[in-house]
Swiss-Prot record:
Protein's organism: Phaseolus vulgaris (Kidney bean)
Classification of source organism: Eukaryota, Viridiplantae, Streptophyta, Embryophyta, Tracheophyta
Designated name of the protein: 36 kDa cell wall protein
Primary localization: secreted
Compartment annotation: Secreted, Cell wall
Keywords: Cell wall, Secreted
GO CC annotation: extracellular region
Region: Disordered, residue numbers: 1-20
Amino acid sequence: DVNGGGHTLPQPLYQTTVVL
């Protein structure tokens, strides 16, 4: 996603950050 996290789906910003 935009944050470069492991989620490809539109997850919340905090969610993508945790995966990062």
